[in-house]
Curated annotation (Swiss-Prot):
Leader sequence residues: 1-23
Listed GO MF terms: endopeptidase inhibitor activity
Record carries keyword Signal: yes
UniProt cross-references to PANTHER family, sorted A to Z: ALPHA-2-MACROGLOBULIN HOMOLOG (PTHR40094), UBIQUITIN DOMAIN-CONTAINING PROTEIN (PTHR40094:SF1)
Gene3D superfamilies from the UniProt entry: 1.50.10.20, 2.60.40.1930
The species this protein was found in: Rickettsia conorii (strain ATCC VR-613 / Malish 7)
Highest taxon listed in the record's lineage: Bacteria
Family: Belongs to the protease inhibitor I39 (alpha-2-macroglobulin) family. Bacterial alpha-2-macroglobulin subfamily.
CDD domains: A2M_like (cd02891)
Keywords attached to this entry: Protease inhibitor, Signal, Thioester bond
Record's protein name: Alpha-2-macroglobulin
Residues in cross-link Isoglutamyl cysteine thioester (Cys-Gln): C1441-Q1444
Length: 1892
């Protein structure tokens, strides 16, 4: 006790000292010293941690309580370590410094760390600014050393050793210095060794000799001399013994270890034994004893040595100890010889297993349940490699209790009324069954359906609210107890549940016929221990319902007992209240039609189909998914017609457009009967951008033929990505009916200049190709028609597994024995094309000669000296097989009845898809037997699993001839599963056919519940009125329904099939056109024995009829070749009078876009979906009781739009418009007409001309290509953009197309505009006629920003052959452009302040380019000075969430009627109107159904409360000024605010939002006193001491004021303190500038009288807060406050302010805001006022010429950007044409998540985004790095812009770029910022990358 007291006193004493020191530390310097916390871990690449400790307390490391303000900061610039090691230094969260090394420490090396003391605050004093430490020596840990043996190949025995080191080691030095020694012989054993990827862990396998009769030991020792991989002291065992070298978890460092090697009699062990209950295939429970061993042993061997004893139930008395009744035996040591003698020896049966030698052995016993068994395995058990069980094994196991179970048999719910009406009940271990039959009144079906679950009502009827409404509300209940008459309750018992006695057929008017809820359960002491229930319908009426496009219902009814159509059946649809909605009767064909009821609702909501006759009743739930037939596995997809029978087809002229381009969309509309006229039809086009926002709605008028066009326009700031142009039919009440759409892509692109083709040397029209000598030929062609010679081509092969499919023999199944199971990818290198543009690749497939695989050869062809390229790929099957063998059968091979005839046909096919001979084959027939293998699942539960074993039956030699197939007659005498193998003399398998022969009571292991129906039509195409012949192969006998369907049912036929193979027919109706579907539904015969598969099967097969009737032929006549700059004349004609559109497009654009020529005929005729929905109850039919019981005796039961305009490149190059011509709609008929287009002089290439024509009842397309060529064709490859000082090479290819010019000298003259400087180029070059040559022009980008031109003029002085000595100059010129843009994005900074005296000097710290730059000073005696810069900042704000768009426009509303200020600010009134109109429209689009507004234009986003209030504030101000605010948007917004004000409050931020909402509601004449009371109640309860100083109270005060409750308002204001600090939270809509601005605004608007005594410092503070802490919201609020305040103050003295800058002096006069525009060259600005005290605002906007010191700026976010090669290694030099990955890694610099972040990454010049993956993050997630998932990505040709949320964990984003030009290029500085926190941003550094 004394010691405890002393410790307590000492602790109190130290704490008091500590508290004194803490208190003193706020007034004096805190002396700190450095303490290394993890010195015993410093090795390898482990992190280093340093604590900063208060040196005044020596006993332990005490950390001061005063914040350093350095948490999370990266401090590499302030710390040095010697010797140097790269890594990241960072402050931790509390007086802690962490170092994460990028490379390994040196072993046993002393390091010195020096920390600059000026990084610390002034209150810190360092005892020393350095600390030293020594890393650990190289030390090993032998983690594992175990004897192991392979349980599959038991001869393999080995020792596995795992050794870890604390540093990466030199692998070779360990191999030389490690030994494994066998103790008995002292011999050194050989070993193999593998290292992990960083060489810190070795896994060593030591094979050992065969075991002997004696145990042995193997030792491992690591000798001195193992070397660390990265330098330092080598390993010595003395360091292991050093007690100072300890691991943190007390893991022992070690250099030697040993392991015991067992003897022959010590290794084999019985590891476990247990008893369990497992059901056999007859559902009979079996008692199983399971014995497991540690190594495989034969079950027979265990059986020989196994004894099982049933121990006595009672423990006998022994040596005076009393016995015990019902004793639970547990310990084998309790079993004496006497007890063993009194035990009963139990017989057992070994269960077969696969394989027979295994570690788990199962024995079946039959003994008493709940009794104990002694398991004894006598010593002497031997394995095949002589391992022996050295001692007896004893274990007591408990036999489990017998299971108790009850269930209704089979699946299904319908019993035939004409049958036995009985359903067996399966029971086990049950002596009494409790039955409950709830007979449901027919009139209550509506309640049954509406009150139960919507899925699977028959099999699992569950009432939704069973405590208030259940089966007893709608039924009559019958209960019965049934005694189970069974001699052995442990065997399955079957009790019939007879439904006949529960209904009376004689009661003609009875409404309680055949619908029951059957329940069966078992009890134990009145507790239900097992139960089952099922809805049972006893009926003879089966139905199929087909609902067509119009909602019409076709009811097909048949008798279940005989399959005949049921005539005279009343068919109704009933509603929710039970009343009949529509009714009809079936005709003699069992068919009835019920009309459309889609518009029925409320009490008439349809719930069921009801079928009734005099004495029968059936029903089916209406529109339930479990009753609908799923056709997804059939080819039923296609276009869907509108409700009005209209189909529309839209096509674009080229599929891809750059921003700010226009495109043409063609529209074609037809009625399904081709009869309609369409002039005057109300149609609308809607254009949706990639974010899902509708950006255009336009009314469209078509001509009578249904032909029209739409002009698609894009803006310069258009989002890149996929746009949908949709056509709608406008309804009567403004509702739109969708017809169709076309998608086009908007993005920067370069048209292809070449075409690439691939061919293989020996694969013409072949199914497969032999791999020997296989070659691929790549042909490159310039799109102006000449071979592309001397071009680099890269080749790649991709090899994957495949299967054969032969279209000509699609009914046959083919098998490939040469199975390649792996994937391979190989780069074949580069080849240069020859004079024909050809490159030949030898594929070198020798290593794959013995495999069959799918080969894809890919080629990439490059433009000369450029990285731009075209790609192509081609696939084929490669195999060495001489032929393949396929088989088919007219029988269903899964279900062949015994003693029936069935055959399998085999054919041999060559690679030409022709039948060939296949001699000398062997046909092996094998039977598949199934062994019930006992297996354990993951939970330890045991069950039988059927394992197939093949047994040889017969082997026959066969031949397949070329003319005849081989017909194999299937042996069907004996039931079972069989497999046929066809092999050649090398035992290569050519075919494998499996079949099952089904006999009575035989159900094989592979039966499924799916019934496959095979249907084949006699042909694919028909004429209307033809009869279709169907070959139907059914899984059982029965009857069926055949229908012809499209969007309606055209015809139907019932049929009956007494055999599994039958021919049926159905007629195509007269007048049928286009694509249709033959739908076959088949129902199992009531007497059929195939009861373990579904009684309902179906199949759908498409066909066509009359498809050429509506084809329109088009004749296009045009020249094959034309010169650039000439006029192209196209002559056209059509076979039928109508209209035509002709368009011509650069084939390079179409190639890049992957454009498909319009094919409207195929769409209107063939592209038609199956639109009839089918529902049925046939799959619920239960098998008859005798069939069911017969089978069960033998087998088991079958149970926000982001506007990034200002982030675009404003220095865009002036690109040439794309080559695309559009004629518009022209008249066309048999007379030939002409249309002309002007070909630009700069275009050379292929022009594709396409014509699309339409008449009332015909349509057609046609296309033709022509070449456009100049005498000299010039193709430069200029980068799309460059940065100042980039030096690069531009390849210019010139093709000599001048006839008779020979080997001509081509003279070159190259000029550039100011943005480019020529460094070098050749002035002339010889070029042969019809040849090309490439020159390289060396250029440098200058500081002149904007579009820069490169003009190339090539000329030939050509001597005319017919005029001697007369030379004619032939020349061509081409001007190409690039963008010279800075290597950093545009940044706007605003410097705001208040000057107390009359002078100020402002420094301009930025050096910006003059282009798009702005330097503006505004000044005033009033705070109006701040509105100019902030308005400019908002007008050019680069992002566009809902808040930012509102903030951009709030000033426009507030200034709308302020004419003087509008003029001073030079605001354009027209622009104001356009901007306001746009924001009103945007707010309407971003409004949710609840009336609130989304943050972005993402349709799934919830309404944002603050944004919604802010939006309504904006709209309210607009409505006050009588602007065109959408009334429905406004009214819905008010509704949202009312609901919002009623919600519960969970925080002060939420209270402020609700107070703001109440303020807006009050402003709009809503009585809000109750809302205010609720808010005040919450505030007083949860924020009693803080809320009075929050902006919340000012909003409430203003609301009180508007409610004329002045006293309450004044009280709130009097208690409010403005300058109370704001608590730091993650809430982003509240900061000091917002608080001060809104306070001033509310006071000025509602309490102007308080302005008389207003502290002017409040207004001045707004300017000071705005100095460096503004965002879009706070800037908007600051403008709002300034305007309101200026409007209310009585008088502002006129002032004169002189502005003196470098270039000029300006004198400003006025009493409002005064503005001066200055040159961006200024570095200093002096302001001199005529009186003291004025506000100013300095705005600087533009692109920085050089980043300050080119150092990264890290403000709360850290970003790393790397360029990685294909091996993920960082590179600064790449080769032309390389694809590289840009990897951006980022994380928050604090412990909080940063939301609303934007990241802008400019591409280096000479690179282009890869089109395939530039829109997604290509990374896969790893454990180390989180993959960033941005909210939105916008890609342009020179930049990637990404928006999202960044956490405090490392997050990585990747995209790929391609090097396309040689040169030295600037790598731009990456930039990121938080859109709501100006203090959080990042700017990287500018570097260089070389492309060579």
């Amino acid at each position: 006790m004394k010691n405890i007291f002393r410790k307590f006193v000492f602790t109190i004493f130290v704490c008091l000292i500590n508290l004194q020191l803490i208190a003193a530390s706020f007034n004096e310097k805190i002396p700190l010293y450095f303490k290394l916390t993890n010195e015993n871990l410093l090795a390898g690449q482990n992190a280093l941690n340093i604590d900063l400790c208060d040196s005044r307390i020596k006993e332990w490391c005490t950390k001061p309580q005063r914040e350093l303000g350095l948490n999370g900061k990266k401090i590499n610039d302030y710390i040095s370590i010697s010797p140097d090691i790269k890594g990241e230094w960072r402050f931790g969260w509390w007086y802690n410094i962490n170092f994460t090394p990028e490379s390994n420490f040196v072993a046993h090396q002393t390091y010195k760390i020096t920390i600059e003391d000026y990084i610390f605050p002034n209150f810190v004093g360092l005892k020393s600014n350095n600390i030293s430490f020594t890393t650990l020596p190289l030390l090993p840990i032998i983690k594992e050393m175990n004897y192991l043996q392979d349980n599959i190949d038991i001869s393999k025995k080995f020792v596995q050793t795992k050794i870890a080191f604390n540093y990466p080691i030199d692998p070779k030095t360990l191999e030389e210095r490690i030994e494994f020694i066998k103790s008995s012989t002292k011999e050194k054993l050989p070993f193999s060794i593998k290292f992990n990827t960083n060489n810190t862990e070795a896994t060593i396998i030591t094979n050992i000799p065969p075991l002997t009769d004696k145990e042995d030991t193997i030792s491992v020792i690591i000798k001195d001399g193992v070397k660390p991989l990265h330098g330092g002291e080598v390993f010595t065992y003395k360091n292991v013994k050093d007690p100072n070298n300890k691991t943190p978890n007390n893991i022992r460092y070690s250099y030697k270890e040993n392991v015991l090697i067992p003897s022959l009699s010590s290794y084999l062990k019985i590891t476990n034994s247990t008893a369990t209950i497992v059901k056999d295939d007859k559902l009979k429970p079996e008692q199983i004893i399971i014995i497991t061993t540690n190594t495989p042993v034969s079950g027979e061997e265990i059986k020989k040595h196994l004894e099982l004893f049933l121990l006595p139930q009672d423990k006998p008395a022994f040596l005076g100890v009393a016995g015990k009744k019902n004793y639970k035996w547990q310990n084998p040591k309790e079993i004496t010889d006497d007890i063993l003698k009194s035990s009963e020896k139990i017989n057992f049966e070994l269960l077969s297993s696969v394989p027979s030698i295994t570690t788990m052995h199962s024995f079946k016993v039959d003994t008493f349940a709940s009794r104990a068994l002694l398991v004894k395995v006598n010593q002497g058990v031997k394995t095949s490699d002589n391992l022996t069980l050295g001692s007896d094994y004893f274990q007591i196991v408990q036999i489990p209790d017998n299971p108790k179970e009850v269930k209704l048999m089979s699946d299904g719910s319908i019993l035939s009324l004409a049958g036995k009406r009985k359903l067996p009940v399966y029971s086990l271990g049950i002596d009494k069954l409790y039955l409950e039959i709830d007979r449901i009144n027919q009139q209550e079906v509506n309640h049954l359906i509406s009150q139960t679950n919507r899925y699977n009502i028959f099999q699992n009827p569950t009432f939704i609210n069973e405590y208030t409404f259940n089966e007893y509300n709608i039924s009559e209940v019958f209960q019965e107890e049934v005694i189970v008459n069974s001699q052995n309750l442990n065997l399955p018992h079957y009790t019939d549940l007879d439904f006949s006695k529960y209904f009376n057929l004689e009661e003609a008017g009875s409404y309680s016929k055949g619908l029951f809820l059957a329940k069966v359960y078992a009890k134990d002491n009145n507790n239900i221990i097992s139960q089952d229930k099922r809805l049972i319908l006893v009926t003879d009426l089966g139905c199929i319902v087909k609902t067509d496009k119009t909602g019409t219902h076709h009811i097909f009814v048949s008798y279940i007992s005989n399959g005949k159509p049921a005539g005279g059946v009343k068919a109704d649809i009933i509603g929710l209240n039970g009343e009949v909605l529509v009714s009809s009767k079936t005709d003699s064909k069992g068919h009835a039609v019920l009309s459309n009821i889609n518009d029925f609702s409320k009490e008439k909501t349809p719930v069921a189909y009801i079928l009734t006759t005099k004495d029968d009743f059936a029903f089916m739930p209406y529109s339930r998914i479990d009753r609908q037939v799923n056709y997804s596995r059939f080819d039923v997809a296609g276009a869907v017609s509108s409700d009005q029978g209209l189909k529309a087809y839209l096509f674009s002229d080229r599929g891809i457009y750059r921003p700010n381009e226009q495109g043409h969309i063609g529209i074609m509309l037809k009625q399904t009967d081709w009869q309609g006229k369409f002039d005057g039809l109300p149609l609308e086009i809607q254009v949706t951008n990639p974010r899902g926002k509708v950006i255009d709605k336009s009314k469209i008028v078509l001509d009578a033929e249904g032909f029209g066009e739409y002009l698609f326009s894009t803006l310069d700031d258009a989002l890149t990505g996929l746009y949908n142009i949709s056509l709608y039919l406008v309804g009567d009440k403004g509702s739109n009916n969708y017809l169709n759409s076309v998608s086009v892509r908007v993005g920067d692109f370069q048209p292809d200049r070449m075409k690439i083709n691939i061919n293989f040397n020996n694969s013409q029209d072949e199914l497969w190709t032999n791999p020997k000598d296989l070659k691929a030929t790549v042909n490159l062609i310039n799109l102006y028609g000449t071979p592309a010679e001397n071009r680099k081509v890269s080749g790649f092969i991709d090899i994957r597994p495949t299967e054969f499919f032969v279209p000509r023999f699609k009914e046959y199944k083919f098998y490939s024995s040469k199975g390649n199971k792996e994937f391979f990818y190989e780069r074949l290198g580069d080849i240069t094309t020859d004079s024909k543009g050809t490159a030949n690749f030898d594929l070198n497939l020798e290593k794959y000669y013995n495999a069959t695989f799918n080969l894809t050869f890919s080629a990439e062809g490059f433009e000369p000296d450029s990285g731009r390229s075209v790609n192509a790929s081609k696939s084929l099957i490669v195999s060495p097989l001489p032929y393949i063998i396929g088989f088919r059968s007219d029988s269903d091979l899964k279900y062949i009845k015994t003693k029936t005839s069935a055959a399998i046909e085999f054919i041999a096919i060559s690679n030409k898809a022709e039948k060939v001979a296949a001699p000398n084959l062997t046909l092996n027939l094998k039977k598949i037997n199934y062994v019930n293998n006992l297996v354990a699942d993951s939970n330890g539960n045991y069950s039988y699993s059927s394992v197939p074993i093949e047994t040889n039956i017969s082997s026959d030699k066969i031949n397949i001839t070329a003319n005849e197939s081989y017909i194999y007659k299937v042996p069907t005498k004996e039931a079972g599963d069989y497999v046929i193998y066809l092999t050649d003399k090398e035992d290569t398998i050519f075919a494998q056919a499996e079949f099952s022969v089904i006999g009575e009571g035989n159900v094989t292991a592979n039966l499924t519940d799916k019934a496959n129906l095979k249907v084949k039509l006699d042909k694919d195409d028909y004429t209307a009125g033809d009869t279709i012949l169907l070959n139907i192969i059914t899984p059982y006998t029965g009857y069926g329904l055949i229908t012809i369907e499209t969007d309606k049912v055209h015809n139907f036929e019932w049929f009956k099939a007494d055999e599994n193979n039958s021919i049926q027919e159905i007629k195509i109706p007269d007048g049928f056109e286009g694509k249709g579907y033959v739908n076959v539904q088949f129902i199992r015969d009531i007497e059929a024995t195939e009861i373990f598969i579904s009684p309902f099967s179906y199949a759908v097969v498409p066909f066509t009829a009359g498809i050429y009737k509506h084809k329109q032929d088009i004749g296009l006549t045009l020249p094959a070749k034309i010169k650039s700059g000439e006029k192209l004349a196209i002559r056209y004609r059509t076979t039928n009078p109508g209209k035509i559109i002709i368009f011509a497009v650069d084939a390079g654009i179409l190639s890049f876009a992957g454009y498909q020529t319009p094919d409207p005929l195929n769409y209107f005729i063939n592209d038609k979906a199956l639109e009839v929905r089918t529902s049925q109850i046939m799959d619920l039919i239960l098998p008859e009781r005798p069939l069911l019981m017969k089978a069960y005796m033998a087998a088991p039961a079958g149970d926000g739009c982001i506007n990034v305009a200002r982030n675009l490149n404003p220095f865009k190059r002036k690109s040439q418009p794309p080559i695309a011509f559009w004629s518009g709609i022209l008249e066309a008929d048999l007379d030939e007409r002409e249309v002309t287009f002007d070909i630009p002089s700069y275009f050379n290439g292929t022009l594709r001309v396409i014509g699309v024509a339409s008449s009332l009842d015909s349509i057609g397309t046609s296309k033709a290509d022509l070449l456009v060529q100049s005498d000299l064709i010039i193709n430069p490859n200029l980068p799309l953009f460059v940065a100042p000082n980039d030096e690069f090479t531009v390849p210019v290819t010139i093709f000599n197309n001048l006839k008779d010019s020979g080997n001509a000298q081509v003279f070159l003259n190259i000029e550039t505009s100011e943005g480019l400087k020529i460094l070098d180029y050749p002035k002339e070059i010889p070029i042969d006629e019809n040849k090309e040559a490439t020159i390289n022009v060396k250029l440098k980008a200058t500081d002149q920003l904007g579009s820069a031109d490169l003009k190339v003029v090539a000329s030939i002085n050509h001597l005319k052959p017919d005029i001697i000595s007369m030379a004619v100059v032939h020349s061509s010129e081409l001007t190409s452009t690039t963008s010279v843009r800075p290597a950093s994005p545009s940044v706007t900074t605003v410097n705001t302040g208040f000057i107390t005296d009359n002078k100020a000097n402002l420094k301009i710290l930025r050096d910006v380019y003059p282009e798009f730059a702005k330097l503006q000073i505004s000044a005033s005696k009033s705070p109006l000075a701040i509105i100019s810069g902030f308005k400019d900042f908002l007008d050019n704000y680069p992002y566009g969430c809902t808040e930012q768009l509102i903030s951009q426009n709030f000033a426009n509303i507030l200034l709308y009627n302020e004419q003087e200020l509008v003029q001073i600010l030079k605001t354009d009134r027209k622009n104001m109107d356009e901007s306001l109109s746009k924001i009103f429209q945007t707010l309407s689009e971003r409004q949710n159904y609840d009336g609130g507004f989304r943050y972005w234009n993402n349709f799934n986003d919830d309404s944002d409360p603050f944004i919604s209030v802010y939006a309504m504030h904006f709209l309210s101000e607009g409505a006050t000024r009588y602007l065109a605010v959408p009334s429905d948007t406004f009214n819905q917004g008010i509704y949202y605010l009312e609901n919002m004000a009623n919600r519960s409050i969970n925080s002060l931020d939420e209270a402020r939002e609700k107070a703001y909402a109440v303020y807006i509601l009050t402003q709009n004449s809503v009585i809000t006193t109750s809302y205010i009371a609720n808010i005040l109640k919450y505030l007083d309860e949860y924020h009693k001491n803080t809320w009075q100083d929050d902006l919340t109270s000012v909003y409430l005060a203003a609301s009180y004021k508007m409610l004329q409750m002045n006293e309450e308002a004044e009280k709130l204001l009097d208690r409010f303190t403005l300058n109370k600090p704001i608590s730091k939270t993650d809430y982003q809509y509240y900061n000091p500038l917002i608080k001060y601005s809104q306070y001033l605004y509310l006071i000025a608007m509602h309490f102007p009288e308080r302005l008389k005594d207003f502290d002017p410092k409040i207004v001045q503070d707004i300017a000071l807060f705005a100095k460096d802490n503004y965002n879009s919201l706070s800037a908007s609020y600051a403008i709002m406050a300034s305007l309101a305040y200026a409007d209310k103050i009585n008088h502002v003295d006129e002032a004169t302010i002189k502005v003196t800058s470098t270039d000029k002096e300006v004198t400003l006069k006025g009493n409002k805001v005064m503005i001066a525009e200055l040159s961006v060259e200024n570095k200093n600005i002096d302001l001199t006022s005529s009186s003291n005290g004025f506000f100013y605002q300095l705005l600087t906007s533009g692109y920085d010429k050089q980043l300050t010191e080119n150092k990264e700026i890290v403000k709360g976010i850290e970003i790393t950007k790397k360029y990685l090669d294909e091996n993920n290694k960082e590179v600064s030099k790449v080769k032309l044409g390389d694809n590289i990955t840009v990897e951006i890694t980022m994380r928050s610099g604090s412990n909080k998540t940063l939301s609303n972040m934007v990241l802008i990454d400019l591409l280096p010049a000479g690179f282009e985004l890869l089109p395939d993956n530039n829109h997604i993050n290509i990374l896969e997630r790893t454990q180390e790095v989180m993959i960033w998932k941005p909210i939105y990505i916008n890609n342009r040709d020179d930049r990637v812009m990404i928006f999202g949320t960044i956490s405090d964990q490392k997050m990585t984003y990747q995209y790929k770029i391609k090097a396309v030009n040689k040169g030295i290029f600037s790598t731009p500085a990456i930039y990121s910022e938080a859109m709501y926190d100006p203090q959080t941003y990042y700017r990287g550094v500018i570097g260089n990358i070389i492309v060579e």
